[in-house]
C-alpha cells in the first residue's frame, strides 16, 4: 500500500510502498479517507532533537485521520464494516494502575500511533478496536480528521470552569486557536490569545476571540485595561511552550487563577515561583485526551454549533503531500488536510 514514511534519519518525509498491516483478534482495519498534518509531524519532518531520540526509522508516520472500517478482528464487538471512525492515537496497556482505575489517558506505558508504531499516513491503518471512535453522520470528514488535535484543545480548555471567566490563551497555533474558540462557545467572558504570528492571530479573530494580541507590538496589560479587567485572568491555557509567554501568563493571572499547560517548554525553563505560591495558582499538566470523555465532548461541541471550519485552511490530494508539509512548516496555515481518496 501507499504510505508516507520516515525513511531516513535526516530532514524530509517520503512516499513509499509498504505491506498492508496485519489484523489482530482485537483490532479494526481502517481504510483512510483523509489525514491532517500535526505539529508533531513537522517535528518528525524537520528531524529535530526530540525526533532523533523518539522516532524509529523507517516507519509510517501520522496520527490525525478519518476513515472507514473494512475489516474487524474476531474478538471485536460494537463495530461493523463500513463504520466511519477516527481513533485515539495513544495506545494504552490496560493493566497498569491508571488504566485499571479508569484514568487511561495517564497510562505510564502509552505508545503513540505514528510516533512509536506505524501511523495513519497510509491507505490502511490497524489499531485496537478500543481506540476507535465512531463519528456521527452530521460531522464532515474534514472536521473528523482533526479530532486528535481538537481533543487536545478540548481537554485543555475544559479543565476548569469557564462560564463568565476571563481566559488567556498563549500560543495561536491550531490547538490554541481551537481552545480559544471552545472557551467562547461555552460561555467565557473575555478570551484573549497571544502570539507573534500575524497570520495565526488573524485566524484566531475569525474563530471569535475577544482580542488577538501580537505581543511584539502590544502590551498585554494595556489590552486588559482596554477590556475593563481589573483583577487578572481567571484561567490560563499555555499552548506555546515559550518561556516568555508562560512568565507573562503568571504575572497577569488573578490570585487563585488556574492554568492548564499543554505546550512543552524547555526542561530548564526558569519562572518566578513566588508568583505561583503567593498568588495561590493551580497548574495542571495536560497530555492527550481523556479516554473517552474528551471524544464525546468533541462530537457534542460540534453538534451544538461550535464552528471549527475556519481552522482548516488548506487541502491537498495525497500526491501533493510536499506542498502540505511546506505550508505547515512556513507557519502560514491553520490545519492542512491530505486527501487519500
From Swiss-Prot:
UniProt subcellular location: Cytoplasm
Metabolic or biological pathway: Amino-acid degradation; L-threonine degradation via oxydo-reductase pathway; glycine from L-threonine: step 1/2
Residue sites binding NAD(+) per the record: 175, 195, 200, 262-264, 286-287
UniProt xrefs under InterPro entries: ADH-like_C, ADH-like_N, ADH_Zn_CS, GroES-like_sf, L-Threonine_3-DHase, NAD(P)-bd_dom_sf, PKS_ER, Zn_alcohol_dh
Keyword NAD: yes
Site features described as Important for catalytic activity for the proton relay mechanism but does not participate directly in the coordination of zinc atom, chain residue numbers: 148
Substrates-to-products reaction catalysed: L-threonine + NAD(+) = (2S)-2-amino-3-oxobutanoate + NADH + H(+)
EC primary class: oxidoreductase
Family membership: Belongs to the zinc-containing alcohol dehydrogenase family.
Name of the protein: L-threonine 3-dehydrogenase
Amino acid at each position: 500500500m501507499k504510505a508516507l514514511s520516515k525513511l531516513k534519519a535526516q530532514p524530509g518525509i517520503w512516499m513509499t510502498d509498504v505491506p498492508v498491516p496485519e489484523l489482530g483478534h482485537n483490532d479494526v482495519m481502517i481504510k483512510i479517507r483523509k489525514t491532517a498534518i500535526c505539529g508533531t509531524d513537522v517535528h518528525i519532518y524537520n528531524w529535530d532533537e526530540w525526533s532523533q531520540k523518539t522516532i524509529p526509522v523507517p516507519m509510517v508516520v501520522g496520527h490525525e485521520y478519518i476513515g472507514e472500517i473494512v475489516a474487524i478482528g474476531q474478538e471485536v464487538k460494537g463495530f461493523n464494516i463500513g463504520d466511519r471512525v477516527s481513533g485515539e492515537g495513544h495506545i494504552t496497556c490496560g493493566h497498569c494502575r491508571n488504566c485499571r482505575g479508569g484514568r487511561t489517558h495517564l497510562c505510564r506505558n502509552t505508545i503513540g500511533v505514528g510516533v512509536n508504531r506505524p501511523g495513519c499516513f497510509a491507505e490502511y491503518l490497524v489499531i485496537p478496536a478500543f481506540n476507535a471512535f465512531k463519528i456521527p453522520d452530521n460531522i464532515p470528514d474534514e472536521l473528523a480528521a482533526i479530532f486528535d488535535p481538537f481533543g487536545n484543545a478540548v481537554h485543555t480548555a475544559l479543565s476548569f470552569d469557564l462560564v463568565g471567566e476571563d481566559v488567556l490563551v498563549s500560543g495561536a497555533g491550531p490547538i490554541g486557536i481551537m481552545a480559544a474558540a471552545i472557551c467562547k462557545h461555552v460561555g467565557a467572558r473575555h478570551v484573549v490569545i497571544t502570539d507573534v504570528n500575524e497570520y495565526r492571530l488573524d485566524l484566531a479573530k475569525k474563530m471569535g476571540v475577544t482580542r488577538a494580541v501580537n505581543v511584539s507590538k502590544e502590551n498585554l496589560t494595556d489590552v486588559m485595561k482596554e477590556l475593563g479587567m481589573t483583577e487578572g485572568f481567571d484561567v490560563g491555557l499555555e499552548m506555546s511552550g515559550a518561556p516568555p509567554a508562560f512568565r507573562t501568563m503568571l504575572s497577569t493571572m488573578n490570585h487563585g487563577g488556574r492554568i492548564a499547560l499543554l505546550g512543552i517548554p524547555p526542561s530548564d525553563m526558569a519562572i518566578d515561583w513566588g508568583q505561583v505560591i503567593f498568588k495561590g495558582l493551580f497548574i495542571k499538566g495536560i497530555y492527550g485526551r481523556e479516554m473517552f470523555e474528551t471524544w464525546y465532548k468533541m462530537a457534542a461541541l460540534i453538534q451544538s454549533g461550535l464552528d471549527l471550519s475556519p481552522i482548516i485552511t488548506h487541502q491537498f490530494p495525497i500526491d501533493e503531500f510536499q506542498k502540505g508539509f511546506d505550508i505547515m512548516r512556513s507557519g502560514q496555515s491553520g490545519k492542512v488536510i491530505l486527501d487519500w481518496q
